[in-house]
Structure formats: C-alpha cells, structure tokens
Amino acid sequence: MEFHIRANQAPGKLAILPGAFNPPTRAHLAMAESALTVVDEVLFVLPRAFPHKEYSGAGFDIRMELLRAALGGNPRFSLASSDRGLFIELALEARDDYGADTQLSVLCGRDAAERIVSWDYGGGDNIERQLEVFDLLVAARSGHYDPPPPIRNRITSIALPAGVEEISSSEVRQRIRAGEPWHDLVPAPVARLIEQRMEFWLSG
C-alpha cells in the first residue's frame, strides 16, 4: 500500500473505503463523513487493478488527482493506492501500516456488502473468517441491508444524508455523455477537473 495523503494522528478505529472512483461523487464523501461518526479516520484506497472490472476511460493517475481534490484537506481523511483489490487484502495491508491495535472496518454500500457476503472465494477465506480481520460499515444506499444472522454482529449500518443515496459514478458518466446536468453529483473541485479532462468522460 502506497500512501498519497496520510492523516497526522494514529487512529484507534479506521474505516477503509475502496473504490474505482470513476469519478469520486458526493455519495463517496457523504459515506466517509458519516463513517467519521463511528471511526477516527477514513482511508480512501484506489486499487491499481480491480478483482471484478478493468480500468476504462479515466486512468489511475487522473482518478488519483480527482480523489486528492475531493478530499479537500480533511485532516481525518487519508488516501492510498494498492496493487490489491479484495477487501481482505486491503485490510491486511492496512493492518501492516496501522498496527494491530487499530480496529479495522471496510466501508461500502449495500450492493458491495451483498457481493462480498455471497462471493465464492474458491476455498479461501470465507466471509466469516474475513470478518475476524475487519468489520463492515454499510451505507444504506439503494435500500436497507439486512445481513445474515451469523455475521450480523460484525456489520454496522450508517445513515446517509437525504439526496445522496442514489448518486453513483456511473450516473455521472452517463449524464456527461448524454449532455445532461451532472455538476451537482460531484464535489465542486472534482467538477472543475472533469471539465478540464472532458475527453475521458465522453469516451469511457
């Protein structure tokens, strides 16, 4: 894991927010800010490769530039990149960097939580074993998440402000390509950078 922005103080509780961030949206920031009510620091992680998708449109360097702008100097936000992509891999990397005394959570939306719980890990660590390393913080996006009883005590739901639950990166890209309004879906610094690199959003 390579840090690009590092918060100053060692957190007792850390939330890891992995994503493709294509582009970062107001929903990403709202998730992180809501998580700060229960953790000390949020670590945004942009993988250099993804387990279930490939890079298209804006590349790694541009997305990292957008993330730097989106975080806006919040002293409780950190930013890192990783050659890994699975939640358990990122959590173990964070454990190496933050130490055994830091309580780890992975922050995600309901759709991602449902995927990780049901994913076939091919004989590797199942979700119960992974949740021995980290908890899940699940933002109530696109409906409430009701986790299976065996892992319910390792999953915490966090609320999002009204109006951001349905915002997604794919919606931003679709609106840009369709010539529809999109600026209110992303932080203002991100919108300015997108305007400067519009060719990546019109093609990807």
Which sequence ranges carry the predicted segments?
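Nucleotidyltransferase catalytic core that binds NTPs
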Residues: 1-204
